């Protein structure tokens, strides 16, 4: 038997046999036919199931994978692997079947009987096409885990495709308590499951009645990102797995055009300090209303050229076939493992594998490949349209798997106990629990001296990083560290680059992720949840980070509400060269939008601080690193300012959000409230003038305004001052005047209780 050359397996990253050059195509087809003739079990798998077919190229690739089985088998031989691949086809078909029901049906019949009109939803909803495309992808991920005996993490950029994840996790029993207590595999349990999807029902307290969401949520097993903001998963994934961990990133071709920076991963990923990370784009060629830009520019072949220019090795996958996904995951990992111990960035072998899984949008159901596939692929509503109902029932019959056959397939893929590995719900990136770092006592500045708060933070960040070598550091930097007084951190951690420039603070293993793209660099910090992180930017440019930050805030809050609070170290975002320091660059560089938006979020997950000197900045940063699961924005002066607070006062300010820096509020005739360093200086000058005129004043430094608000729920309450603490600062009989960094008219009313 003559085996196809390796070039035939990878030629131009072909996904199916007909894309190969003629000679190699014949070679692969002949070899696949011989494999089927000589191995009955292989032939049974190769025959496919329902709408799932295995192209000859996939067959040959899978055979090559099986020949390496001894390296990965974890107790399985060739027949065991083939048995799992056969099972995967049945599970994928059942997944397609259930996803279609989630969109259209409110009743499920496991015996496969046709549904009558009353069994359908009067108002179907579902992002169906993308969800159908994700079914073979996620099954391929499950099979790769089972075949290799290793549980990988996953992230999905197209969060609206969550129906695929939830449906398959229900089939395989990979559930969190909210799903396990509500759904099962009976007709009644499955009917409740599909009826809950897009039900919009709410409880008396205003929370959703259904744990199913339109996007990845806290109950989506293994979910780490909502995926509602297209493009951020594409920026997060290379920074997510720690060395020794594994991740599969399912990416969107629509997000590829949405977000700059998704093709920069080869600049950041290194075999030396990153875990194995497999990016796979679901290339279905369509946005909501038209073809994607990739499709318009030339499709898969254009994308291959683009990716190679950016340091990737494109590998074509059949997006209709779970076996192709499983092979792609294991193949890309094998190529990455070959880089361990090697440092030859110019070598072809250093390219980062990138799977391109092409399939018609909505594969497996009527309407595939057209605009309708995005949401509701049928031409009518089966609840009221006979033709649409017949189309649904006919398509569902092709996807249906007999219960006994499906149960056997599900059992074949449930190998966690025998392999001693975690369930997919418990993968490393979904269960981060980072121990609080060692935080040295800061070098407190002497009251009355002048210093740059940013320079003080620079010194302290470096101390913390050196005290905690077990934590991988990442600093997100839109090319401003030196101008923002972070020289020491940059010199020690260095820009991460492919080819370092002599005499510049650059290194291949640098920990500073620098790009003139705020979304890309903030995602470096947000993705590194197993490490310690920081982002530094001009305040005005921070608003470009808002979408990514808000996604993290939402997910963290929902996890807390679900009883699984996030265990990653809180992430500080230093906003400097701020509104009161950047007048030289006109109003475009004086933009307080980010902090105004973050102040609207819940204070337990989103903190906005206004340090007034070096000591208060140090205390707030230290408090940030001593907490979990929060985004902490600090508006920090970079110019020298007078140190007003002692270390002890600063620590109290970081905890309470407010501190008295002059006078006694209970004895005062007027209170001056300052938010910000420059505002405090003016408030103190005003207090001196008023004192000279025999008007007793007290000056209160408000370091975290949200501490003064009326808590909006029980989770936020511990992060706000109680009435006793509030009245000690703001006696109700004393008038007060605020000197704020913000001119927005809603500032005081949104941050402070009316009792103030």
What function would you assign to each model-found segment?
Residues 2-172, 453-458, 462, 477:
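N-terminal amphipathic, basic-rich helices that act as targeting or association modules
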Residues 84-114, 119-272, 487-489, 519-528, ...:
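Cofactor-binding active-site loop characterized by glycine-rich and histidine/acidic residues
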Residues 85-90, 100-109, 154, 410-568, ...:
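Non-catalytic terminal/interface segments that mediate subunit docking, oligomerization
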Residues 119-135, 154-161, 207-226, 252-255, ...:
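Active-site nucleophile and cofactor-binding loops and adjacent substrate-binding regions
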Residues 172-176, 475, 680:
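Alpha-helical support elements that line or immediately flank enzyme active sites
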Residues 175-190, 269-280, 309, 503-506, ...:
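A glycine-rich helix N-cap at a beta->alpha junction
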Residues 193-211, 217, 222-226, 240-248, ...:
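Thiamine diphosphate
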Residues 256-268, 549-557, 618:
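Acidic/histidine-rich catalytic neighborhood of metal-dependent amide-processing enzymes
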